[in-house]
Design a protein with these regions (language model features):
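N-terminal cofactor/phosphate-binding cores enriched in small/glycine residues
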Residues: 1-51
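Fe-S ferredoxin-like electron-transfer domains
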Residues: 29-167
């Protein structure tokens, strides 16, 4: 991802923050590319470049995979009209791919996380979370305060503060 970015190529990314102290994790899969001679696509943010490696960033296969990833993530989001952050990075990536909504089944209402406004100084709204872990890495590795973790497994993963207590 960084080599492509340095050459002016745009590869979408969601779980990678190109800033000092942030390491790529590759878990959102929004940055998939084709590598010549390899059967499977690779997450460009975590793939180490090697001498002679030929990376295809704009093939139909890579574009299709990235588009499907974003479409699956949008299926678990509130509709843009009611989203709390209509200008989020996810929506920017969706716009760049021409996606306004997902054609996949949307998240069931009972699975949408509730707003936590129990603290006087902050509100936590996880309804737009894509479980990428960027907030965890930011707290653990950049801020070095380790106050956010992930709980659950698979599709039922969510960020938690301390012991998943209300704020």
């Amino acid at each position: 991802w960084e080599v492509a970015h340095g050459r002016g190529l745009v590869i979408p990314h969601l779980c990678h923050k190109p800033a000092p102290g942030y390491r790529p994790d590759g878990n959102c899969r929004a940055c998939m590319v084709e590598i010549e001679g390899e059967r499977v696509l690779a997450a460009s943010c975590i793939r180490e470049p090697s001498e002679g490696m030929v990376v295809v960033t704009d093939s139909a296969r890579a574009r299709g995979a990235r588009r499907m990833v974003v479409e699956m993530l949008l299926a678990d989001q509130p509709e843009r009209e009611v989203a709390h952050d209509r200008s989020s990075h996810l929506w920017d990536v969706a716009d760049a791919q021409g996606l306004q909504a997902s054609r996949l089944p949307t998240m069931e209402v009972e699975r949408i996380p509730l707003l936590d406004d129990s603290h006087v100084a902050m509100r936590v709204n996880l309804d737009a979370c894509i479980q990428c872990g960027l907030c965890v890495r930011a707290c653990r590795e950049v801020q070095v305060n380790d106050v956010i973790g992930m709980a659950g497994r698979g599709h039922d993963t969510w960020p938690v503060f301390d012991f998943d207590d209300p704020m």
